[in-house]
Amino acid sequence: MTRPVVTRFAPSPTGFLHIGGGRTALFNWLYARKHGGTMLLRIEDTDRQRSTQEAIDAILDGLKWLGIDWDGDTVYQFARAARHREVAEQLLAAGKAYRCYATAEELTAMRDKARAEGRAKLYDGSWRDRDPSEAPAGVKPTIRLKAPLTGETVIEDQVQGRVAWQNENLDDLVLLRGDGTPTYMLAVVVDDHDMGVTHVIRGDDHLINAARQKQIYDAMEWELPVMAHIPLIHGPDGSKLSKRHGALGVDAYRAMGYLPAALRNYLVRLGWSHGDQEIFTTQEMIDAFDLPAIGRSAARFDFAKLESLNGHYIRQSDDHSLVTLLEDLLKYIPQGPAIATKFDDSIRAKLTQAMPGLKERAKTLIELLDNAGFIFADRPLALDPKAQAVLTPETRQLIGRLRAALEDVSPWTAATTEAAMRAFAEQAGLKLGAVAQPLRVALTGRTTSPGIFDVLAVLGRDECLSRLADQSA
C-alpha cells in the first residue's frame, strides 16, 4: 500500500525567507497538494547563536504572504534534541557508531595531511575500532557513525537521476558533538523519519548531504524518503544569484510591489516547465506539477520577466482588491505611513474609480501607487521638472481660461468635461492636445497620467477648479 505523500519545508531561521527558499517551499506545497498529501513546516533552529525569533517570524510571514500554508503544528528542531541524542545512543549500543576522542589539534593535523595527499576523506577513523579504555583524560568524545568502508552509496534522485558516491571517500560523520549537541545531519534524518516525510524536495546544494543521511537511514534500518534535489537559482548571466540579481527576501518583493500570485507563478517556472504555458492559476499549478518535469540546470532569474508577469496580474486583478493591496503595501515602504494618513473612504472610492486606467500602465504596485499619487497629493501640487517646463506664463494664462470654461460644467463627468474642453479648443483654434497637456500638468503635477478626462472625473469639480486656480496666471 502506497503511503500518503508527506513533504516538508525546513528553513534555518538565520535571516529572511530567501527567494530560493520560497521556491523550495512552493515546490513542496504543490507536490503535496497534487497528491492529496500534507506539507509540514520544520524550523531548523539548532544554530542557537544565529537563529532568531525575528527570522522565524519573517519566514512564517513570508510563507503566508506567498499563499503557502502548511499542515499541523510547526516543528522546532532544537526542541527535539533529546530524541536526536536517543538515536545516537541507539546506534552506539548497536555497534553502528563509536566514540571518537580525537582532539581538535589531532583532527586539524588529519585534515591537513589528507588535503596534502589529495584524499577526500579527512578523518582517518583512528577511533573506529580502538578500545575506549585508551581514551585520553579530559577529552569529551564525539559520537561518529560507522560508515561503510567499501562499495558505494547511491541516491536515485527524482531530478538528478542516479547519483553515486564511493564509500571510501566518505568520512565517519559526527552524530553528536563533544558537548552532547546533535549535528545537523543526524537531526534532519531523525526529524524526517519521525515526521513521516515521504518526499524530500530541496536545493541541489544538499545533494552531498543526501549521501551522508542515507548512511544514517541504512544504519537505523529506516526507509529512505524519495529524494528530489532541485537546481539552484542563478542570475541572468549564469553566475551565482546576488542581491543585484534578485537574491532578496520574499519580504523585499512585497515591498517592491509584486503580487503574491505573480511571484508564485514566476517561481514555479524557475526550473519547472509545462510545455509553453507561462501563466498558471494556482489550481493549474497543482494539477500540472510533477518532479520529473524539473530540469537539472540552474534556473536563471529574470527581473524583466517577473515585472512583465506582475503587470499581467495587476491588469487582471479586480479594482477593489488592488486598492486593498495598495493600502497593505503602505506598511512596507518608507513613504507609506505619510500616505496612509490620507487613506479614507473618499480616497478609496477615487482610487477604485481611477483603477481601470491606472492598472493598464503599471508593472508593480509601487508604480501603481506612484501613478495614483495625484489622487492624494496635497495642494499646491509639487511639480516634477518636466511639468515645470510646461508651465510658461502663456500656459498659466491658458489654464486660467480652461478653468473658466469648466466652472459651469454640470453634471461633472468625464464625458461632460471632455465636451467642454473640445468646445474650448475649437473656439480657441487649438488642438485638443494643446489643451490636455496644461490641464494634466495642473491637475497631476506631471506630464503623464491616466486619460485626462478620467482624471477630471476622479478628482471632482471642486478639487479640479482649486488645482487649476493654483497654477493659473
Curated annotation (Swiss-Prot):
Its main location: cytoplasm. Keywords: Aminoacyl-tRNA synthetase, ATP-binding, Cytoplasm, Ligase, Nucleotide-binding, Protein biosynthesis. The keyword ATP-binding applies. A motif ('KMSKS' region) lies at residues 240-244. Coiled coil: none annotated. It catalyses: tRNA(Glu) + L-glutamate + ATP = L-glutamyl-tRNA(Glu) + AMP + diphosphate. Gene3D superfamilies: 1.10.10.350, HUPs. It is found in: Cytoplasm. SUPFAM superfamilies: An anticodon-binding domain of class I aminoacyl-tRNA synthetases (SSF48163), Nucleotidylyl transferase (SSF52374). GO terms for biological process: glutamyl-tRNA aminoacylation. ATP binds at K243. Pfam families: Anticodon_2, tRNA-synt_1c. It is an enzyme of class 6 (ligase). InterPro entries: aa-tRNA-synth_I_cd-bd, aa-tRNA-synth_I_codon-bd_sub2, aa-tRNA-synth_I_CS, aa_tRNA-synth_I_cd-bd_sf, Glu-tRNA-ligase_bac/mito, Glu/Gln-tRNA-synth, Glu/Gln-tRNA-synth_Ib_cat-dom, GluQ/Sye. A motif ('HIGH' region) lies at residues 11-21. One of its GO terms (molecular function) is tRNA binding. Its EC number is 6.1.1.17. One of its GO terms (cellular component) is cytosol. Catalyzes the attachment of glutamate to tRNA(Glu) in a two-step reaction: glutamate is first activated by ATP to form Glu-AMP and then transferred to the acceptor end of tRNA(Glu). Belongs to the class-I aminoacyl-tRNA synthetase family. Glutamate--tRNA ligase type 1 subfamily. This is Glutamate--tRNA ligase. The gene is gltX.
